[in-house]
Amino acid sequence: MSNTQLSYKDAGVDIHTGNELVERIKGDVKRTRRSEVMGGLGGFGALCALPTKYKEPILVSGTDGVGTKLRLAIDLKKHDTIGQDLVAMCVNDLIVQGAEPLFFLDYYATGKLDVDVAASVIKGIADGCEMSGCALVGGETTEMPGMYHEGDYDLAGFCVGVVEKSEIIDGTAVKTGDTLIALGSSGAHSNGYSLIRKVLEVSGANPADLLEGKPLSEHFLAPTKIYVKSILQLIKQTEVHAIAHLTGGGFWENIPRVLPANTKAVIDESSWQWPAIFNWLQEKGNISRYEMYRTFNCGVGMVISLPEKEVETALALLEQAGEKAWVIGKIEHLGEGEAQVEIQ
């Protein structure tokens, strides 16, 4: 039995600090608000109506993290954009099915809450929500003494979107003869970071070393691109058959996820140049071409399949939206024993 009266704070959990964080982030949460959201922060659950423009609304959900990119961000003390990465990983998975993101929730866990760090992370989450037009409606911030090393934290995100039932994009419309359009990435996005950290280790490179005039750290911590508004415009004005989000598994595993069993994607490797950071990784890590395309996006964030007649319009729309877009390949019939992705 303790001779002194114990409190939760004595055990390492400071409720006052948590309340201070809530006050700090209220403004960031408010700027993401959508008209469908009811109430504010502090409720047991977040309430959101379905947008009235949908006749047969289908909800689409997704959850994700940022992998070990978070380790790099913590080590380099750059916390302001990792939240955008978190949102991007979730909303980009929704938009490929044609879904407009509605609301987002985050999970932030740490051993001892640092209000400044947490507020910076959540501001980044709000930035990402603003970019994708979805509301940050709540989340969980938990202080768990003994569970994390000092200064460490973990992040997860959850998003819900909506799509008209008749407009779901699921790849079933993909046909032989379709053209493939690529959307450029902002860097490695949030995949392959365990290998990136290994390359940094074995090469002895310093994150402050320059590549094309920028520190390696800037290349590696460039926030994941959010494609929501560009793709929403595209699918409103053109016929889109499928969209693949190039995340873990790269080209080899993500493109087949949206292809009918009798088709293959033929990628023209000469249609683009890898951004310098991917060439650096391949050289310093002695990584095979196959492994590069399995682990990294190599400069391609999305691959879109659409009819050839839509290509000119699609490229113009994407350019207007500020995207780097180009024809990267085509859909062909899959022969016996062939792989569903060929990179030539």
UniProtKB/Swiss-Prot annotation:
An example GO CC term for this entry is: cytosol
Q: Which reaction does it catalyse?
A: 2-formamido-N(1)-(5-O-phospho-beta-D-ribosyl)acetamidine + ATP = 5-amino-1-(5-phospho-beta-D-ribosyl)imidazole + ADP + phosphate + H(+)
Determine the domain of life of the protein's source: Bacteria
Q: Provide the alphabetized UniProt keywords.
A: ATP-binding, Cytoplasm, Ligase, Nucleotide-binding, Purine biosynthesis
Pathway it acts in? Purine metabolism; IMP biosynthesis via de novo pathway; 5-amino-1-(5-phospho-D-ribosyl)imidazole from N(2)-formyl-N(1)-(5-phospho-D-ribosyl)glycinamide: step 2/2
Q: Known EC number(s)?
A: 6.3.3.1
Q: Name the principal localization, coarsely classed.
A: cytoplasm
Check the record and name the InterPro entries matching this protein: PurM-like_C_dom, PurM-like_C_sf, PurM-like_N, PurM-like_N_sf, PurM_cligase
Where in or outside the cell it occurs: the entry states: Cytoplasm
The entry lists its GO molecular-function terms as:
ATP binding; phosphoribosylamine-glycine ligase activity; phosphoribosylformylglycinamidine cyclo-ligase activity
Per the record, the GO terms for biological process are: 'de novo' IMP biosynthetic process; adenine biosynthetic process
Top enzyme class, one word, equals ligase
Q: Which family does this protein fall into?
A: Belongs to the AIR synthase family.
Name of the protein in its database record = Phosphoribosylformylglycinamidine cyclo-ligase
What species does this protein belong to?
A: Haemophilus influenzae (strain 86-028NP)
